[in-house]
């Protein structure tokens, strides 16, 4: 598959087909091509000998997609940066990535960034003044060059830039279109922010099949009335989200085939799909196919998939995450470095062309997590699991990294920032489960000196500081104050004891 050519084909064959919809804003495939060509031409003229990544800032604006394609047509990887990401984290991404340029689809509130900022108005001028110019196709990102870089949580307090190449993305997109039986011209739900790699599961499968991306933003999600009004208008046929988002939608009685009569496929990734959520979806959408998938950002969105039927639900209380895509393979590694036999638990290692080339500017972290096996790139996921008859079962994290509401985070990073707060002497983050999946984060804090009379005022002050350093989804929901943190005999935090204390 020639990814960019495949997307551009629709600008010629169906130029007026809508490529992307967000509220009242929409763009056609013709406009997507013209504006991304104009932008790529401008980037190439401004930075003729430069291939540094470009930051793309915004939320669900159509310009985000235009900017992504404009960057890669000019030979630059893009770094999606959502509006919700705090200033301090944006600053660290800018510094780590070596980006020289930031394209903005929304007002940039972060100050003193070491990059040139192209505002919304500047972008419109570029689209207008460079209209009709086409970039040199030889300049476009190809092969093992980076297509996008997504920053994920890092245990040192610094986010890690996962480099995904053109070949990685082509491998994923081709597999998704074929294995999930995606058809030409379908409407895809776009619920995940672009800085979360779940969004890649809908963006490129939609664009290469001439589909329409229907974007739902965070404000809509916060207002159910607006959310369901939008869904009712959408005629979505391919649903891509975390299971948590679907579970929230199922709380609305009208969320069913009557609201979305042409729903054909549910694609789930990012966290555990509970058996009962899948069962309810089958009841509400009897004609739709439900696919459960698995994969870390470092292996390009997902590498396994399984069609969840009533038979599968009856057979497994905890659902399997699927069979591996044909060009990759899964190894289950035991602690001694040998491969575990069928049915035995160990660390999931992914091998093949979906695997990232590593973390940008972090050779030590890359060496720790990535390796070569039989001449192919391999990623040690840190996830526990086992394979039985080719079917992968996921058993949670081996370390302190978890997925909460679809967002992957390292508890050590949150602890790092929490301990840096005023009024905090010591802190441990305890993820609290509800059934099979994590429900919220509890911060167990040993407070330092403070003058607050009430605990809730202390909590407010700590949360205020955390909001300046971490995205909202990484802020603990509850706080508990103790005089000390339990330790193991070898001087480590006794997390098992702490968990038993807080859940007793």
Swiss-Prot record:
Keywords: ATP-binding, Cytoplasm, Ligase, Nucleotide-binding
InterPro entries in the cross-refs: AA_adenyl_dom, AMP-bd_C, AMP-bd_C_sf, AMP-binding_CS, AMP-dep_synth/lig_dom, ANL_N_sf, DltA, DltA-like
Localization per record: Cytoplasm
Root EC class: ligase
Residues the entry annotates as binding ATP: 152-153, 292-297, 383, 394-397, 492
GO CC term, one of those recorded: cytoplasm
Pathway: Cell wall biogenesis; lipoteichoic acid biosynthesis
Binding site for D-alanine: 197, 301, 492
EC number: 6.2.1.54
A single GO molecular function term of this UniProt record: D-alanine [D-alanyl carrier protein] ligase activity
Domain of life: Bacteria
GO BP terms, alphabetized: lipoteichoic acid biosynthetic process
Enzymatic reactions: holo-[D-alanyl-carrier protein] + D-alanine + ATP = D-alanyl-[D-alanyl-carrier protein] + AMP + diphosphate
Physiological role: Catalyzes the first step in the D-alanylation of lipoteichoic acid (LTA), the activation of D-alanine and its transfer onto the D-alanyl carrier protein (Dcp) DltC. In an ATP-dependent two-step reaction, forms a high energy D-alanyl-AMP intermediate, followed by transfer of the D-alanyl residue as a thiol ester to the phosphopantheinyl prosthetic group of the Dcp. D-alanylation of LTA plays an important role in modulating the properties of the cell wall in Gram-positive bacteria, influencing the net charge of the cell wall.
Family indicated by similarity: Belongs to the ATP-dependent AMP-binding enzyme family. DltA subfamily.
Protein name stated in the entry: D-alanine--D-alanyl carrier protein ligase
């Amino acid at each position: 598959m020639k990814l960019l050519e495949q997307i551009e084909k629709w600008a010629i064959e169906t130029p007026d087909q809508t490529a992307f919809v967000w509220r009242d804003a929409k763009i056609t495939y013709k406009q997507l091509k013209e504006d991304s060509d104009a932008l790529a031409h401008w980037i190439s003229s401004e930075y003729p000998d430069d291939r540094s990544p470009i930051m793309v800032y915004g939320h669900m604006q159509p310009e985000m997609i235009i900017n992504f394609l404009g960057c890669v047509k000019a030979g630059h990887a893009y770094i999606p940066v959502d509006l919700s990401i705090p200033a301090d984290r944006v600053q660290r991404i800018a510094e780590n990535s070596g980006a020289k340029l930031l394209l903005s689809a929304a007002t940039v509130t972060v100050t003193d960034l070491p990059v040139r900022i192209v505002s919304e108005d500047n972008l419109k001028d570029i689209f207008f003044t460079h209209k009709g110019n086409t970039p040199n196709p030889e300049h476009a990102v190809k092969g093992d060059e980076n297509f996008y870089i997504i920053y994920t949580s890092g245990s040192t307090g610094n986010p890690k830039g996962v480099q995904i190449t053109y070949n990685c993305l082509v491998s994923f997109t081709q597999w998704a279109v074929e294995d999930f039986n995606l058809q030409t011209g379908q409407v895809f739900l776009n619920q995940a922010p672009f800085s979360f790699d779940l969004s890649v599961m809908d963006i490129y499968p939609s664009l290469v099949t001439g589909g329409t991306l229907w974007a739902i933003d965070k404000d809509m999600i916060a207002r159910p009335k607006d959310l369901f009004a939008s869904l009712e208008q959408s005629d979505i046929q391919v649903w891509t989200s975390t299971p948590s988002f679907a579970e929230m939608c199922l709380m609305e009685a009208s969320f069913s085939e009557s609201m979305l009569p042409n729903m054909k496929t549910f694609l789930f990734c990012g966290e555990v799909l509970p058996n009962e959520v899948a069962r309810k979806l089958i009841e509400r959408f009897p004609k739709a196919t439900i696919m459960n998938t698995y994969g870390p950002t470092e292996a390009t969105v997902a590498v396994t998939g399984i069609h969840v039927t009533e038979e599968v639900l009856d057979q497994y209380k905890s659902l399997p995450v699927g069979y591996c895509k044909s060009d990759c393979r899964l190894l289950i590694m035991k602690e001694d470095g040998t491969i575990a036999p069928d049915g035995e638990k160990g660390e999931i290692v992914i091998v093949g062309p979906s695997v990232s080339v590593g973390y940008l500017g972090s050779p030590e972290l890359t060496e720790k997590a990535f390796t070569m096996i039989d001449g192919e790139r391999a990623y040690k996921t840190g996830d526990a699991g086992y394979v039985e008859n080719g079917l992968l079962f996921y058993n949670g994290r081996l370390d302190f990294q978890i997925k909460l509401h679809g967002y992957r985070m390292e508890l050590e990073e949150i602890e790092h920032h929490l301990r840096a707060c005023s009024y905090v002497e010591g802190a441990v983050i305890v993820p609290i489960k509800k059934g099979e999946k994590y429900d919220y984060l509890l911060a167990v804090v040993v407070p330092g000196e403070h003058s607050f009379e009430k605990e809730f005022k202390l909590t407010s002050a700590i949360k205020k500081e955390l909001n300046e350093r971490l995205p909202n989804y990484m802020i603990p929901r509850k706080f508990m104050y103790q005089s000390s943190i339990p330790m193991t005999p070898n001087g480590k935090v006794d997390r098992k004891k702490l968990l038993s204390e807080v859940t007793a």
